[in-house]
UniProtKB/Swiss-Prot annotation:
Family: Belongs to the IUNH family. RihB subfamily.
GO BP terms, alphabetized: purine nucleoside catabolic process; pyrimidine nucleobase metabolic process; pyrimidine ribonucleoside catabolic process
Keyword NAD: no
Cofactor note: Binds 1 Ca(2+) ion per monomer.
Annotated organism of origin: Escherichia coli O1:K1 / APEC
Cofactor(s), by name: Ca(2+)
Gene Ontology MF, one: purine nucleosidase activity
Entry EC no(s): 3.2.2.8
The protein's name in its UniProt record: Pyrimidine-specific ribonucleoside hydrolase RihB
Residues that bind substrate: 227, 239
Lineage of the organism: Bacteria, Pseudomonadati, Pseudomonadota, Gammaproteobacteria, Enterobacterales
Function: Hydrolyzes cytidine or uridine to ribose and cytosine or uracil, respectively. Has a clear preference for cytidine over uridine. Strictly specific for ribonucleosides.
Amino acid sequence: MEKRKIILDCDPGHDDAIAIMMAAKHPAIDLLGITIVAGNQTLDKTLINGLNVCQKLEINVPVYAGMPQPIMRQQIVADNIHGETGLDGPVFEPLTRQAENTHAVKYIIDTLMASDGDITLVPVGPLSNIAVAMRMQPAILPKIREIVLMGGAYGTGNFTPSAEFNIFADPEAARVVFTSGVPLVMMGLDLTNQTVCTPDVIARMERAGGPAGELFSDIMNFTLKTQFENYGLAGGPVHDATCIGYLINPDGIKTQEMYVEVDVNSGPCYGRTVCDELGVLGKPANTKVGITIDTDWFWGLVEECVRGYIKTH
């Protein structure tokens, strides 16, 4: 099995923590580094959350802090979903893990420039780090094997009727990424909302056990509460983890090639990913957009990763 070399760019975040847990453990993934961006909460909080997850699960991967603000717009956070810390729910031991001194954008540029074009970027938060790296050093573009991102929707948004949170948090950054010419795979809400974590799924991961089973339970029990309060849903989607699922086995997720454009005009559609599902514009597709996911396969994959953290000695 080929190991996919990835840099996971995230804004932890409950579903981000599940993505970190999966990416660090599955044998099909070679997690080179974790870069942190502001998004679900401010950068100081998302950085601590990422370090806490790595410390709890003994994930020995370097963590880099990146962009604390969007490129242009005023900052927004998703405290209604992720709480005051950005990862409310779990209780962590005192933090001793530290971030690297290098800025995440510099790390992304340096790592790509030194590579053979075999590294995939996996941004599951706002695209600020990726866009700034592209603008600072355009020579990285041909070095990126693929970008597999969580964001957008070809249907309805979740932060506004038009826009999904990650794109709405920095639409200008998303515009840079979607016009970059790099091969893109987009896991939008239409797909990620199919991965609804119900109490049955939580109980399954608790039975699987180990530190990751405990963390999954603490994280998703909080998510169930906020999803019900905000959207009336009886479960919480694990949006970001779908990107890791796709990288492990793309056959579990059906995609359709579309031309996708990000609306950066101020107005009710600001931050919308306009997906030409029917091909009416006649423009060449620039994105593989996730349509459906085999949920039985997906939860089996999550459980496999959870079990990977159980110590056998």
